[in-house]
């Protein structure tokens, strides 16, 4: 689907756990899992890049963390409000690629795009071997929904409230997989890439960067790779992890 600018009507905006919200906007969209939209609230000058959590019929769902002025204004929006949106943007994950045995690995709000990714991969190949590994600080979210599409779910939390107490990288048996698809904090993805390189496992990561335009013009979101600087919003956000220079 080509990028477009539109004013979407908010259908639902609810808090899933403390500081994490689920925003549903009425909009018919065809996206690649891992793509994102720039979402602008009325009192902010620039939009915020928010990845697509899932597409259901004529609704697009975004799951976001409240971390600044834009997202803190976003959380106050109610059903019927209009919100300015540009997208879909970026490349997303290639769901037609033969990944073999796949591990979906996320950290924190990087869990958001994993739902649409799991749905798309399962729809494209019902026999795919696919497990989900999610790392959270304390409370967990989207896990039950993702579990509907994967074979196995394993969770870690920093506090030990759910699953393994520690980091998600500590519960990831790379020897069981051919490919890792990952999204989360850069420090976590760097560790995952290092582990995959050592284990000779393919890894694709969705980078999270500050963005101003979302269309490749401002060069705020540069990602360093072995083949030169890339624009996260235009050339990414999904990159071959083994090519990224952290």
UniProtKB/Swiss-Prot annotation:
GO biological process terms, alphabetically, are: 'de novo' UMP biosynthetic process
Which species does this protein come from?
Answer: Clostridium perfringens (strain 13 / Type A)
Please give the cofactor(s) recorded in the UniProt entry for this protein.
[2Fe-2S] cluster; FAD
For whether the record's keyword set contains Electron transport, the answer is: yes
Protein name per UniProt: Dihydroorotate dehydrogenase B (NAD(+)), electron transfer subunit
| Annotated residues for binding of [2Fe-2S] cluster | 213, 218, 221, 233
Which residues does the UniProt record annotate as the domain FAD-binding FR-type?
3-95
Q: Does the keyword Iron-sulfur apply?
A: yes
Subunit structure comment from the entry: Heterotetramer of 2 PyrK and 2 PyrD type B subunits.
Among Pfam families, the record links this protein to: DHODB_Fe-S_bind, NAD_binding_1
Q: Could you tell me the keywords of this UniProt record?
A: 2Fe-2S, Electron transport, FAD, Flavoprotein, Iron, Iron-sulfur, Metal-binding, Pyrimidine biosynthesis, Transport
Q: What does this protein do?
A: Responsible for channeling the electrons from the oxidation of dihydroorotate from the FMN redox center in the PyrD type B subunit to the ultimate electron acceptor NAD(+).
Q: Any idea which GO molecular function terms this record carries?
A: 2 iron, 2 sulfur cluster binding; electron transfer activity; flavin adenine dinucleotide binding; metal ion binding; oxidoreductase activity
Please state which protein family the record places this protein in: Belongs to the PyrK family.
Q: Which NCBIfam families match?
A: PRK00054.1-3
Q: Which domain of life is it from?
A: Bacteria
Q: How is the cofactor bound?
A: Binds 1 [2Fe-2S] cluster per subunit. Binds 1 FAD per subunit.
Q: Where does FAD bind?
A: 48-51, 70-71
UniProt pathway: Pyrimidine metabolism; UMP biosynthesis via de novo pathway; orotate from (S)-dihydroorotate (NAD(+) route): step 1/1
